């Protein structure tokens, strides 16, 4: 429970965060009911407020001004579910790590075959099967009960992930409205709904997305001073999801130990939470790997304490995250980065009453975002998914920055034009919030449309392969080899194959790194140590397949060819084109217009190649 002084400041702040007319209307509570009493600013008596509400004023509600838009928690939840289901259906798989490290092992758990990466080899044990079972168990029963097409299992899992994300966002929305005010909560809601980053990450089968769900839910619990629940959610995020997500919980730990001095609760719930999550996790992973395995410890050891670590997979400059942040959050990203400076300016020129929050000052409650950026910006190896856990915080900090700009604008205007006391800052500055919301929404929709248009071809192309199952040529007793060369990283996964008798095969290309291989047949396949796996990203000839044994071939024709990467579609004696879809050629396209779709302009400044699905003409083995 917040102290009386903080509670009084919060009540004043909540009143500040309404779009006040001269005659404020009764409004529903956060849960959509009308039982919540109107907030009374600190230092004001109810009878005086009632008299003011009964006095007619020019421009008030009696002239037909609309009620303020304050979505209830249930309304917000419905919009979140709608947005995340759209992501489940239309988002493409942006990261090959998601395909090979998660969708493929999940396919193995559900259907008994799939590709294995070196991270799942028992001698390394960097990935946890426990995390996969959260999706694998529902998918397994769905498959056994209804025997659906594999692609339906894929989209069922995605819808589950999207719904889980929406539940987190609902909880966080309520907490933000309580801690930071309804105006900021409303801005955050809009930014989340139209964020490209959330569109991509919310339904991604990645531990970093899982950590986003539970890490941000932990922050929401913390802002409500539900410390025990916050610790438990942080443990789930870090142990069952991504261990580096524990970084989000550091400000929570410091606040408990240094400000609250509640060592007993912290130690007690850390032990309870750790044991509750870690013990079953170790038991499950040990049974899969055939040896004692604690995957979170292994991945931390590999990334931090080995001599090579993740840098062998590529390094990027600091600008990578700056550009990536703008692509995923556009102007909201820029606003979030400048929040610390804007809070200082706000502190210097805006009266203190306008800066209140319920429980924590901004430098504590928002510290997880900037701590995360400080740590991950400094790492040479950068991936888009590394920022997933803080995506909702980017929207929140962007919303707070907009609110600060509104306060500063009103303060400056009130000094210059001598605005009378009692006028609310939102009456004169709401155009700033509307301008930011409209701009960010248009940029977000433009980016989402560009992503779907430019990069969705591999998923659509694999769906075409499902049509082959309905032809007389299909034989359920034959293994069909679907080959892929240089475009292996664009493969969306075995769930897109029409049946269990299709296999992905790799053709040798200019790529010289480690590729996955199929799990062995049999019940103990996850326990087998394969000699061809290594943790140095070195290629192994075992992964390559004989070109002459391919039944289908997936290839992107971008106009560049080598001896190992020929134009397969031109080999008309061997192949016929089943389907060809446009796929962006980045090097031949305008940088801005390929990133954001602009009607009447984009088509004239970008270039597509043909993403082809080829079927072998000549029969083999009598087929």
Curated annotation (Swiss-Prot):
The chain crosses the membrane at residues 152-172, 193-223, 229-254, 266-284, 326-348, 360-378, 390-410, 431-452. It is found in: Endoplasmic reticulum membrane. It comes from the Eukaryota. Pfam families: Glyco_transf_22. GO terms for biological process: protein N-linked glycosylation. Disruption phenotype: Imaginal disc cell proliferation is slowed resulting in smaller imaginal discs with aberrant architecture compared to wild type larvae of the same age. RNAi-mediated knockdown in gut progenitor cells results in increased intestinal stem cell mitotic proliferation. It is an enzyme of class 2 (transferase). GO terms for cellular component: endomembrane system; endoplasmic reticulum membrane. Its EC number is 2.4.1.259, 2.4.1.261. Its main location: endoplasmic reticulum. One of its GO terms (molecular function) is dol-P-Man:Man(6)GlcNAc(2)-PP-Dol alpha-1,2-mannosyltransferase activity. It is a multi-pass membrane protein. Keywords: Endoplasmic reticulum, Glycosyltransferase, Membrane, Transferase, Transmembrane, Transmembrane helix. It catalyses: an alpha-D-Man-(1->2)-alpha-D-Man-(1->2)-alpha-D-Man-(1->3)-[alpha-D-Man-(1->3)-alpha-D-Man-(1->6)]-beta-D-Man-(1->4)-beta-D-GlcNAc-(1->4)-alpha-D-GlcNAc-diphospho-di-trans,poly-cis-dolichol + a di-trans,poly-cis-dolichyl beta-D-mannosyl phosphate = an alpha-D-Man-(1->2)-alpha-D-Man-(1->2)-alpha-D-Man-(1->3)-[alpha-D-Man-(1->2)-alpha-D-Man-(1->3)-alpha-D-Man-(1->6)]-beta-D-Man-(1->4)-beta-D-GlcNAc-(1->4)-alpha-D-GlcNAc-diphospho-di-trans,poly-cis-dolichol + a di-trans,poly-cis-dolichyl phosphate + H(+); an alpha-D-Man-(1->2)-alpha-D-Man-(1->2)-alpha-D-Man-(1->3)-[alpha-D-Man-(1->2)-alpha-D-Man-(1->3)-[alpha-D-Man-(1->6)]-alpha-D-Man-(1->6)]-beta-D-Man-(1->4)-beta-D-GlcNAc-(1->4)-alpha-D-GlcNAc-diphospho-di-trans,poly-cis-dolichol + a di-trans,poly-cis-dolichyl beta-D-mannosyl phosphate = an alpha-D-Man-(1->2)-alpha-D-Man-(1->2)-alpha-D-Man-(1->3)-[alpha-D-Man-(1->2)-alpha-D-Man-(1->3)-[alpha-D-Man-(1->2)-alpha-D-Man-(1->6)]-alpha-D-Man-(1->6)]-beta-D-Man-(1->4)-beta-D-GlcNAc-(1->4)-alpha-D-GlcNAc-diphospho-di-trans,poly-cis-dolichol + a di-trans,poly-cis-dolichyl phosphate + H(+). Induction: Down-regulated by bacterial infection in the gut. InterPro entries: GPI_mannosylTrfase. Pathway: Protein modification; protein glycosylation. Belongs to the glycosyltransferase 22 family. Probable alpha-1,2-mannosyltransferase involved in the N-glycosylation pathway. Probably involved in glycosylation of the TNF receptor grnd, regulating its ligand affinity. Required for normal epithelial growth and architecture. Suppressor of JNK-dependent intestinal stem cell proliferation. This is Alpha-1,2-mannosyltransferase Alg9. The gene is Alg9.
């Amino acid at each position: 429970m917040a102290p009386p002084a903080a509670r009084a400041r919060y009540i004043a702040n909540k009143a500040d965060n309404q779009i006040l007319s001269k005659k404020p209307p009764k409004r529903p509570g956060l849960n959509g009911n009308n039982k919540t009493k109107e907030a009374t600013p600190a230092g004001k008596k109810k009878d005086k407020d009632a008299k003011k509400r009964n006095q007619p004023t020019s421009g008030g509600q009696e002239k037909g001004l609309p009620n303020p838009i304050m979505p209830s928690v249930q309304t917000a939840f419905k919009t979140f579910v709608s947005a995340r289901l759209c992501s489940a259906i239309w988002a493409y798989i942006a990261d090959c790590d998601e395909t090979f490290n998660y969708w493929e092992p999940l396919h193995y758990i559900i259907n008994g075959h799939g590709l294995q990466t070196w991270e799942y080899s028992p001698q390394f044990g960097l990935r946890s099967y426990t995390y996969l079972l959260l999706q694998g168990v529902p998918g397994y029963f769905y498959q056994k009960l209804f025997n659906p097409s594999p692609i339906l299992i894929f989209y069922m899992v995605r819808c589950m992930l999207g719904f889980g994300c929406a539940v987190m966002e609902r909880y966080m929305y309520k907490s933000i409205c309580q801690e930071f005010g309804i105006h900021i909560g409303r801005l955050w809601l809009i930014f989340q709904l139209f964020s490209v980053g959330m569109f991509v990450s919310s339904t991604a089968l990645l531990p970093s997305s899982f950590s986003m769900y539970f890490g941000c839910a932990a922050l929401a619990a913390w802002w409500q001073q539900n410390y025990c629940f916050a610790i438990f959610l942080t443990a789930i995020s870090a142990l069952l999801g991504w261990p580096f997500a524990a970084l989000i919980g550091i400000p929570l730990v410091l606040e408990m130990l240094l400000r609250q001095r509640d060592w007993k609760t912290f130690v007690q719930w850390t032990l309870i939470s750790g044991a509750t999550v870690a013990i079953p996790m170790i038991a499950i992973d040990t049974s899969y790997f055939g040896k004692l395995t604690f995957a979170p410890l292994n991945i931390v050891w590999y990334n931090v304490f080995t001599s090579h670590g993740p840098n062998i997979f590529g390094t990027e400059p600091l600008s990578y995250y700056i550009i990536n942040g703008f692509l995923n959050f556009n102007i909201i990203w820029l606003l979030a980065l400048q929040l610390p400076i804007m809070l200082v300016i706000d502190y210097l020129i805006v009266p203190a009453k306008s800066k209140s929050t319920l429980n924590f000052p901004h430098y504590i409650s928002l510290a997880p975002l900037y701590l995360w950026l400080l740590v991950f910006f400094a790492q040479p190896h950068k991936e888009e998914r590394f920022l997933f856990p803080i995506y909702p915080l980017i929207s929140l900090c962007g919303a707070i920055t907009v609110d600060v700009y509104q306060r500063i604008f009103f303060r400056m205007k009130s000094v210059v034009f001598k605005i009378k006391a009692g006028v609310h800052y939102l009456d004169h500055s709401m155009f700033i919030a509307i301008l930011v919301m409209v701009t960010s929404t248009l940029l977000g929709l433009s980016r989402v449309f560009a992503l779907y248009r430019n990069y969705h071809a591999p998923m659509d192309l694999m769906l075409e392969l499902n049509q082959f199952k309905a032809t007389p040529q299909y034989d359920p007793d034959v293994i069909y080899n679907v080959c892929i060369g240089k475009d292996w990283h664009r493969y969306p996964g075995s769930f897109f194959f029409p049946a269990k008798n299709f296999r992905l095969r790799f053709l040798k290309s200019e790529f010289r790194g480690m590729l996955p291989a199929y799990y062995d047949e049999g019940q103990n396949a996850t326990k087998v140590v394969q000699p061809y796996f290594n943790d140095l990203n070195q290629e192994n000839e075992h992964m390559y397949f004989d070109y002459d044994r391919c039944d289908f071939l997936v290839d992107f024709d971008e106009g560049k060819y080598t001896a190992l990467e020929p134009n397969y579609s031109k080999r008309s004696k061997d192949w016929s084109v089943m389907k060809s879809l446009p796929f962006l050629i980045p090097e031949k396209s305008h940088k801005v217009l390929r990133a954001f779709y602009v009607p009447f302009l984009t088509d004239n400044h970008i270039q597509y190649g043909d993403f082809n699905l080829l079927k072998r003409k000549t029969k083999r083995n009598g087929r």
